[in-house]
UniProtKB/Swiss-Prot annotation:
One of its GO terms (biological process) is purine nucleobase catabolic process. This is Dihydroorotase. Substrate binds at residues 61-63, 93, 276, 307. Keywords: Hydrolase, Metal-binding, Pyrimidine biosynthesis, Zinc. It comes from Streptococcus pyogenes serotype M3 (strain ATCC BAA-595 / MGAS315). Its cofactor is Zn(2+).
Length: 422
């Protein structure tokens, strides 16, 4: 048993926000009250700390199978726990791609060994070929939670329409990475800084928002649920809002890097700041924050994308892989760039990092209640920390190394067990 004493208990589902004690027995919260005594429990003094549901991150890359020099499911789980994250959804762009039941079962068997809750998407198309839709029914029955070809866009509208119909028939949804390659230049560099500093055509805004426009309208026609991943452009927020007003079933996520910083970071952080979609302009950054405030964007998800340091340390930045490690900085970036400046309340930030992503997938997570799951994070919301290369992840490709950020995770509890510090 674990007894958490005197913490500020914040639950986005009930909107509870009060200093209270929380008693955990086994994998459940058994009591939340102003004062609880329990002689046999391990006591955690949470005085002055926030006690919240464990974070739910629905967009991570754990690189297993096939790319375990970058990350694996075990180190990914450790990184999640260090960041206060107790539930994750992995993407299918592994090697081999999670397109068939056999690969899916191998991945889930590895995930089951970890102490946090690890789910995975399967791919929309066979080995990401963009043509042949996978067997949604068989993959769902084998444990996939939804479908995405994340990492690359789905170019064929005909295939997308077929996939939406299949998703509807199987009561699931599709998540999409929106960057039209026919309208894009070099990926990972926003068009402005690409032209001005690097003298080539970069990743354009129109490649993102035109593809979102196409896909939300096909979803509208098919009455299918589409989830837009890591949108980064001001116009993208407006397109999603328009589709939602029409009555389309559209949800959207933003990654912490896109509300925290801009394209200029490429000049100082180098390849660590190279990602798809790229860091954009200040106008775009403020627009995605407005999207979070208005409710157009309901989910914050990291797109945790670890890479080996040698892969990022190339002389030609265009040859470096895109992506950054994000699980261990996401809460701090939200506290520093959304709560501290007054864009979101702490409760609203927590809602977008816990309850909303859990509701999207139907997970029993993202809330604190008696008889509910004992998945919690305990953190100091105002305490500052210096971001260093010492991550639990195998990777250290973060453009935020050297930054002072608010928010220090003190304990992460998953299934009633302290998983951080471990």
């Amino acid at each position: 048993m674990i007894l958490i004493k005197n913490g500020r208990v914040m639950d986005p589902k009930s909107q509870r926000d009060q200093v209270a004690d929380v008693l955990i027995d086994g994998k459940q919260i058994v009591k939340i009250a102003s004062a609880i005594e329990c002689q046999e429990a391990q006591v955690i003094d949470a005085s002055g700390l926030i006690v919240a549901p464990g974070l739910v991150d629905i967009h991570v890359h754990f690189r297993e199978p096939g790319q375990t020099h970058k990350e694996d499911i075990h180190t990914g789980a450790l990184a999640a726990a260090a960041g206060g994250v107790t539930t994750v959804v992995m993407m299918a762009n592994t090697n081999p791609v999670i397109s068939d039941v056999e690969t899916l079962q191998e991945v889930l068997a590895s995930a089951a060994k970890e102490k946090i809750h690890i789910y995975t998407n399967a791919s929309v198309t066979q080995a990401f070929n963009g043509k042949d839709v996978t067997d949604f029914k068989a993959l769902l029955e084998a444990g996939a939670v939804s479908f995405s070809d994340d990492g690359i866009p789905l170019e064929s509208s005909k295939v997308l329409k077929e996939a939406f119909d299949l998703a509807n028939a199987n009561q699931t949804f599709i998540s999409l990475h929106e960057e039209d390659p026919q309208l894009n230049g070099v990926l990972g560099f926003n068009e402005g800084i690409a032209e001005e500093h690097f003298h080539f055509c970069g990743a354009t805004g129109v490649a993102e928002y035109s593809m979102i426009a196409r896909d939300v309208m096909i979803a509208y026609d098919r009455q299918a649920h589409v989830h837009i991943q890591h949108l980064s452009k001001a116009e993208s927020v407006q397109v999603v809002a328009f589709a939602q007003q029409l009555g389309a079933k559209v949800t959207a996520e933003v990654s912490p890097q896109h509300f925290s910083t801009t394209e200029d970071l490429l000049l100082t952080a180098g390849t660590s700041a190279k990602m798809n979609p790229p860091l954009r302009t200040q106008r775009d950054r403020l627009a995605v924050i407005e999207g979070l405030k208005s409710g157009v964007i309901t989910v914050i998800a990291t797109d945790h994308a670890p890479h080996h340091k040698d892969e990022k340390a190339v002389d030609d930045m265009t040859k470096a892989p895109s992506g950054m490690t994000g699980l261990e900085t996401s809460l701090s970036l939200g506290l520093t760039h959304l709560v501290e400046p007054g864009h979101l309340t702490l409760m609203s930030l927590l809602e977008k990092m816990t309850l909303n992503p859990a509701l999207l997938y139907g997970f029993d997570a993202g809330y604190l209640a008696e008889n509910g799951p004992a998945d919690l994070v305990i953190f100091a919301d105002k305490q500052e920390r210096l971001i260093t290369e010492n991550f639990a992840s195998k990777a250290s490709n973060s453009p935020f190394i050297g930054n002072k950020l608010k928010g220090v995770v003190k304990y992460t509890i998953a299934d009633g067990e302290v998983v951080y510090p471990n």
